Amino acid sequence: MSDWSIEDARSGYNVTHWSQGFYGIREDGEVTVSPNPQNPDHKVGLNELAKSMVEAGVSLPVLVRFPQILHHRVESLCEAFNDAIKKYDYQNDYLLVYPIKVNQQKTVVEEILASQKSKEVPQLGLEAGSKPELMAVLAMAQKASSVIVCNGYKDKEYIRLALIGEKLGHKVYIVLEKMSELKMVLIEAEKLGITPRLGLRVRLAFQGKGKWQASGGEKSKFGLSAAQVLKVIAELKSANMLDSLQLLHFHLGSQIANIRDIRQGVSEAGRFYCELRQLGASIDCFDVGGGLAVDYDGTRSQSNNSMNYGLNEYANNIVNVLTDLCNEYEQPMPRIISESGRHLTAHHAVLITDVIGTEAYQPENIQEPSEDAPQLLHNMWQSWLEISGRYDQRAIIEIYHDSQSDISEAHSLFAVGQLSLADRAWAEQANLRVCHEVKGLLSNNNRYHRPVIDELNEKLADKFFVNFSLFQSLPDAWGIDQVFPVLPLSGLDKAPERRAVMLDITCDSDGIVDQYVDGQGIETTLPVPAWSADSPYLIGFFMVGAYQEILGDMHNLFGDTNSAVVRIDERGLSQIESVLEGDTVADVLRYVNLDAVDFMRTYEELVNQHIVEEERASILEELQLGLKGYTYLEDF
């Protein structure tokens, strides 16, 4: 296609919309990163960046973090709420709380906290949902506002640690998830001589729509019913501790795509707040939880992978609803808290790796079957003649369907011994030739052709074998059908010659990416430049900064990848600040209680038994290097 342009590539991969300006495609067809949208000219090619890392000794795959994106996401969300507060004359402020479960990596949490260094009044706190997370935030929250929100189920130790946080100078809100926690908090607070800051997680009747909708609604795993909330109020009153109740919390679920769901949830929770205030509770914080979505596919829709609103609309709806409710009930406006971890972290990380090989269909010439060949093969030859233009007596779709029926029959006949292996091979090649010809004759403009086009794109797609583990690096793609943008990092200045699917290197048929952003929709294959064994072919998996690292598993003992922190300096040049080596083979063996030291002893015994003396040292050295090596492919 001579009329192909970079704009075609940008729209074809929908980069403009899912990237939020952080990623783009340069005129030379290279994918770029621009971590500070305020300096849009500061763009660095990811292909060049990856090559420089490889030259510096960093093996692929590598997870590349751009901390400036984290800073920008914090600032943009706070700015959206600050603007909404001014717009509606809201009489309180906003606090962004980062739930570290989204990404607990030290560099990520520290960079999010570092976004507050220049702030006179920090607008950032931290959230913990377990004892290990609580221990982490107790040591880090002082770098921002020192506000800590404690969610999740709690035992006595968790509660005591949270209360000790108050002694350390933090403001620790212990959010009650179930009735039994209240008694434990009051007992341990008295023992420690601390007045607790309590929060209530209310269980809303309203349930938003999405993959995580079970987080809300009456059957939610977490939260207190209306009756339980009133019981907590009564118990606090009888203990003369009602003033300790300072926060109301609810959570509709992660990735809420429809702004109306958010508005409705805030409205219901807001009435809880106002009525509890009327009952004498001193609640002054309104925690909307998570739910702020990320537009993974860039369609700006209500799909599970998208969102039909922007940051300003999100903030405006929350502030507007609360303003109206507080005015209606004549109650003070509470501090607004949101726990928007996915929004902060998703864009900041990209997994870059290499294609190690492909399996591609190439049309081969077929010869007319012999006169004594099975009639089925003659039927298939006739279909081939018709579709190849030598005859034109039937509709394209009819010929295609007949060919599919014929190949199915061929497989059945082979299975019962009525078709030879050579005949089966001929039938398969004839079917592929028909499919190839049919695809070239179909039109996207004909709606009757579109289902067949989709079917053929999948059937004829190249298989790209990619040096990564889906289960380790993109577990949500496997577990919940999450869509992540995937792009070749170069060659996009030319029209894509092929369509492909990405397969990982695990020994598992589920190790395949089966959904791709393609224009304004999702497809089962990805348009790509053709692969060549003569030059490196790099692939980027984008928006993997939220949840993927901590959820990733070690299927086939593929471990953590290498990771790097990269900044773009004031000159627009990339600076690799740090590299964290991924797991070695010995590391992952240790994880499953296999000892590399014991293995070396065993290897030595076997070498002494079976290898001639002059080869023993080199064999042992290779075995030792194998234990010290990267779990991913390095030589291919």
From Swiss-Prot:
Q: So what EC number does this one have?
A: 4.1.1.19
Read off the CDD domains from this record: PLPDE_III_ADC
The chain residues annotated with the modification N6-(pyridoxal phosphate)lysine are: K101
Query: Mind listing the GO biological process terms from this record?
Result: arginine catabolic process; putrescine biosynthetic process from arginine; spermidine biosynthetic process
So which cofactors does this thing need?
Answer: Mg(2+); pyridoxal 5'-phosphate
Organism superkingdom: Bacteria
Q: According to its UniProt record, in which pathway does this protein act?
A: Amine and polyamine biosynthesis; agmatine biosynthesis; agmatine from L-arginine: step 1/1
Q: EC class of this enzyme?
A: lyase
A single GO molecular function, which one? metal ion binding
- Catalytic activity annotated for this protein? L-arginine + H(+) = agmatine + CO2
Task: List the InterPro entries.
Answer: Ala_racemase/Decarboxylase_C, Arg_decarb_HB, Arg_decarbox_C, Arg_decrbxlase, De-COase2_N, Orn/DAP/Arg_de-COase, PLP-binding_barrel
Q: Which intervals of the chain form a coiled coil?
A: none
Q: Which residues bind substrate?
A: F286, D287, V288, G289, G290, G291, L292, A293, V294, D295, Y296
Q: Which Pfam families match?
A: Arg_decarb_HB, Arg_decarbox_C, Orn_Arg_deC_N
Q: Which UniProt keywords apply?
A: Decarboxylase, Lyase, Magnesium, Metal-binding, Polyamine biosynthesis, Pyridoxal phosphate, Spermidine biosynthesis
Protein's job: Catalyzes the biosynthesis of agmatine from arginine.
Q: Record's family?
A: Belongs to the Orn/Lys/Arg decarboxylase class-II family. SpeA subfamily.
NCBIfam families to which the protein is assigned, alphabetical: PRK05354.1, speA
What name appears for this protein in its UniProt entry?
Answer: Biosynthetic arginine decarboxylase
Q: Which organism is it from?
A: Shewanella frigidimarina (strain NCIMB 400)
